[in-house]
């Protein structure tokens, strides 16, 4: 069940749904607008000949932070990682879904490629997979509205929420745009 504005406010007031910093003006009829943080991860195209999800490639991306008051310019065809300004904390019976903003989509900005789902139990900043599919560069301003977070109530609490030792929660507690840890999916125990 998708939570309404009144349910979202009630969950935040009760301390069950964490959104820091919280601004009530960002609450929409069935979502909460989230804003863009000031850090980005750009791909180092000259360090590797290809991307291998099975290998740890620490130098695949570099952290970039525009100077105060300056935007980040995303050029046509480029893909970078960003993150939400807000720290999101979900209890074991609420899940999240991050969607892009329609106004930005109409400019050619994609907010996420595939990872729009947030498991119950997650706590951290949401990493954004930002792509420019337009023919012109797009300026990304830290603090701008970048997406909308929808919250869904589960039919029962998750038995093993994200962050529990059984799940293997690679991104729990992440701060800023966090690079892929897909290589951990290939690690086998002997």
From Swiss-Prot:
Binding site for dCTP: 101-106, 119, 127-129, 148, 162, 174
Catalysed reactions, as listed in the record: dCTP + 2 H2O = dUMP + NH4(+) + diphosphate
Keyword Hydrolase: yes
Gene3D superfamilies xrefs: 2.70.40.10
Active site: 129
GO molecular function, one term: dCTP deaminase activity
Site keyed Important for bifunctional activity: positions: 116-117
SUPFAM superfamilies given in the database record: dUTPase-like (SSF51283)
Recorded metabolic or biological pathway in which this protein acts: Pyrimidine metabolism; dUMP biosynthesis; dUMP from dCTP: step 1/1
GO biological process annotation, one example: dUMP biosynthetic process
Stretch list, region Disordered: 163-190
Biased composition (Polar residues): 171-190
EC class: hydrolase
Keywords assigned: Hydrolase, Nucleotide metabolism, Nucleotide-binding
Enzyme Commission number(s) of this protein: 3.5.4.30
Database matches in NCBIfam families: dCTP_deam
Subunit structure: Homotrimer.
Family: Belongs to the dCTP deaminase family.
PANTHER family in the record: DCTP DEAMINASE
Protein name: dCTP deaminase, dUMP-forming
Organism: Mycobacterium avium (strain 104)
């Amino acid at each position: 069940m998708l939570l309404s504005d009144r349910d979202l406010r009630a969950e935040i007031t009760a301390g069950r749904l964490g959104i820091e910093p919280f601004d009530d003006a960002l609450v929409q009829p069935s979502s909460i607008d989230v804003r863009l943080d000031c850090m980005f991860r750009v791909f180092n195209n000259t360090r590797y000949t290809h991307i291998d999800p099975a290998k740890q490639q620490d130098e695949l991306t570099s952290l970039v932070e525009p100077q105060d008051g300056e935007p980040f310019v995303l050029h046509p065809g480029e893909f970078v990682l960003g993150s939400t300004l807000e720290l999101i904390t979900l209890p074991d019976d609420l899940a999240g879904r991050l969607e892009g903003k329609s106004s930005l989509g109409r400019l050619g900005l994609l907010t996420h490629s595939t990872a729009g789902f947030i498991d119950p139990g997650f706590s951290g900043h949401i990493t954004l997979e930002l792509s420019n599919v337009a023919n012109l560069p797009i300026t990304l301003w830290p603090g701008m509205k970048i997406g909308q977070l929808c919250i869904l109530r589960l039919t029962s609490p998750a038995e093993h929420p994200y962050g529990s030792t059984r799940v293997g929660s690679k991104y729990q507690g992440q701060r800023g745009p966090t690079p892929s840890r897909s290589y951990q999916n290939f690690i086998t125990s002997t």
